[in-house]
């Protein structure tokens, strides 16, 4: 390894110019205070000059009034911005003002989404104690969720009258609407809470219930159509096409013969000409089958009559793969253990078969004609 020694050239310090001395940096002391003092002196000089000019021009008194009013407003602003005093200053005129004491208010930022959801859930479940606890915490009574529902709407949707009454008495807005423009009454009627609506109007309106929230309608059951209909709409339902088609015994009802041929068919017209009617059976003597024969689909190995099965015309729908699916699937050996087990079973069967035809005396004599 090659090393080299490098030395700096000799410095001639004695040849330096005495005027070229090193620069020394000194930290400033009280420069800011001096500048502030100088600026304040300049401001006072400008104000004295302006006051002297205003006094000379005759507007000194007006200018002083403006300055005094500005100082009063500044004091009012400082007083209202003080967080320790709950007061509000109301200016009545140019020279007078009033101080009004404010009630302590709770900010909405103190409640999170969990509190809002708990408040709405308590209204939905009818939990009066939980509702009172949230009201004591000064929660906004008309707070809404993502869908625009308030606690009053949740209570009305479930028919919780006591909760809805408590919220309305504590100042809840009865005319609030959700994102679908539905109010408290509309939501209750939509959920079938007509008794709740009647009770609500009886309590708050002394029974002055509007026509939209009348007593629950009486429903009647139509056995032919298998539906419930309002009692005042029974005549409309009876005259409907659905009810007339289901009423087979009515005069002039459509025939239910099950024959899928029309009056234009030549065979149909020949049978009618011979005195046949749709209520009679087919054939020369009118005693034949008019409907398809109902059968029983047997898919097991149980004996006949062992099971009480229902006779049907159609046992499965179209494109139903389960109808042609084999219920018992043969097990195919897939693992090595199953293959070995199957091989041992086949060997055992072959061994037993050979043992039955072993080279015994009786078998030998039989095949050689000695018996």
Swiss-Prot record:
SUPFAM superfamilies: Ankyrin repeat. ANK repeats lie at residues 147-176. Keywords: ANK repeat. Residues 263-309 form the G-patch domain. SMART domains: ANK, G_patch. GO terms for molecular function: nucleic acid binding. Residues 32-47 have a biased composition (Basic and acidic residues). This is G patch domain and ankyrin repeat-containing protein 1 homolog. Pfam families: Ank_2, G-patch. Residues 32-57 are annotated as: Disordered. Residues 48-57 have a biased composition (Polar residues).
């Amino acid at each position: 390894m090659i090393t080299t020694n490098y030395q700096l050239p000799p410095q001639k310090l004695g040849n330096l110019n005495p005027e070229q001395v090193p620069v020394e940096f000194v930290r400033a002391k009280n420069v800011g205070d001096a500048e502030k003092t100088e600026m304040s002196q300049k401001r006072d000089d400008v104000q004295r000059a302006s006051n002297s000019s205003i006094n000379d021009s005759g507007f000194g008194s007006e200018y002083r009034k403006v300055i005094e009013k500005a100082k009063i407003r500044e004091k009012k602003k400082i007083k209202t911005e003080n967080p320790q005093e709950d007061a509000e200053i109301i200016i009545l005129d140019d020279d007078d003002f009033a101080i009004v004491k404010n009630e302590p208010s709770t900010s909405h930022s103190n409640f999170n989404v969990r509190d809002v959801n708990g408040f709405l859930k308590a209204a939905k479940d009818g939990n009066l104690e939980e509702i009172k606890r949230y009201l004591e915490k000064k929660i906004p009574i008309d707070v809404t969720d993502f869908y625009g529902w308030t606690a009053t709407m949740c209570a009305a949707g479930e028919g919780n009258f006591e909760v809805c009454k408590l919220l309305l008495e504590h100042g809840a807005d009865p005319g609030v609407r959700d994102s679908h423009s539905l109010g408290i009454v509309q939501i209750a009627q939509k959920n079938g809470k007509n008794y709740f609506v009647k009770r609500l109007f009886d309590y708050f309106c002394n029974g002055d219930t509007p026509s939209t929230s009348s007593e629950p309608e009486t429903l009647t059951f139509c056995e032919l159509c298998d539906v419930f209909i309002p009692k005042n709409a029974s005549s409309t339902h009876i005259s409907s096409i659905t009810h007339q088609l289901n009423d087979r015994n009515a005069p002039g009802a459509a025939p239910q013969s099950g024959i899928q041929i029309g009056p234009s068919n030549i065979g149909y017209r020949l049978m009618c000409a011979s005195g046949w009617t749709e209520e009679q059976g087919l054939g020369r003597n009118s005693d034949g089958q008019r409907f398809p024969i109902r059968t029983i689909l047997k898919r097991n190995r149980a004996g006949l009559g062992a099971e009480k099965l229902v006779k049907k015309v159609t046992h499965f729908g179209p494109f139903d793969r389960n109808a042609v699916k084999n219920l018992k699937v043969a097990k195919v050996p897939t693992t090595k253990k199953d293959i070995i087990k199957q091989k041992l079973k086949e060997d055992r069967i072959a061994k037993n078969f050979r043992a039955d035809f072993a080279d015994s005396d009786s078998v030998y004599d039989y095949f050689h004609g000695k018996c």
